[in-house]
Amino acid sequence: MPDKFAALRKKYLSSFPAKLEGVEDAWEKHDMKLLHDLVHKLAGSSGGYGFDEISRQCKNILSQLHESKNTTTNDIERAINQLMQLLSSAQ
């Protein structure tokens, strides 16, 4: 069973470049609905595959998006940049 999970996790990991590109594109286009949807999906799926730090960062971004009245654009951008670094360096 662990070998099967390792294979699934590896396949999921290979999807990170596309996920990173999607998040980056949504942010650059200021498409907050798409950004929210992508980050929300990533928050759930990444945790399920053992990428807990990525999941936590996604939840942080979602929280900031929900409370955008109290959060600056710079804070959200900083959080997204941290997420992109996590996705780029994940193993």
Indicate residue ranges for each PLM-predicted region.
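Solenoid-repeat scaffolds in large eukaryotic assemblies
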Residues: 34-35, 54-55
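Amphipathic, coiled-coil-like alpha-helical segments
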Residues: 2-21, 45-53, 60, 68-91
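A short hydrophobic/aromatic micro-motif that marks alpha-helical segments and, especially, helix-coil
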Residues: 34, 65-66
